Amino acid sequence: MTFAPTTRQKSPLRNIFDHDFLMMHELQKMITAALGEVHGIVLDVGCGHQPYRRWIKSDVTYVGIDIDSTDSTPTIVSNSMRLPFQANTFDSAICFEVLEHVSNPFVVVNEIARVLQPGGILLLSTPQSWRLHEAPYDYFRYTRFGLQHIVQESGLNVEHIIPIGGVWSHVAQTSLNAWPHHQLGRFLNPAIALTNVIFYSLNKLWHDTRDPLGHLLIAHKATEQQLLHNVHYNI
């Protein structure tokens, strides 16, 4: 990454008393399900404290990269805009809640595509709506179409873009983020829990995904056979 954040989350686990439950609970569910597709050698770009490593299968070889080791635990310290690996090195790549913090997301995704082997998988999540965080290294928010454009420009094939939450999650999470958590602390817990339960239920009953909190994208790098087919098709 191109930033040195002051605070990095060590775990995505949340309960209904957490003010960011509506975002993190949905994000965790989607990511843990998608991680079942990760195989071989996996690169975790912007790994932080490796919070998602626990859900990666034990037979997968894990490599975590981050630009800073003062508040993260990377395998390798390096900038994600110039990954220190040869092309076609990794079978899988993951990049969760990182792309909004890099000044040139096209370069980072191009680098991920470069080091993926043909047929390799990328799992990528970004927020669409979230308050300013890890300032001043907070540059972008992504719609599904912006995210799709960046990944397709790298040559990867986008297969799924899954919304995280919906309009009800958005309304509640925006409100909860503004509450005075530091001042009132645990005294807010009952109100936080009630808000989370009500709006989580509303989101399930009336699932409008036009205004989500974020997205999880799944993409693959074309295999050599697919590339040859495309060449013959275009001749």
Locations of regions flagged by a protein language model:
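Residues lining the SAM
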Residues: 96-99, 125
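Residue-level signal for short amphipathic helical patches enriched in basic/charged
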Residues: 37, 100, 142
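Conserved N-terminal segment of class I S-adenosyl-L-methionine
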Residues: 1-88, 92, 96, 106-109, ...
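S-adenosyl-L-methionine-dependent methyltransferase catalytic module, highlighting the catalytic core
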Residues: 5-9, 17, 21, 103-111, ...
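Flexible loop residues that form catalytic
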Residues: 50, 98, 164-166
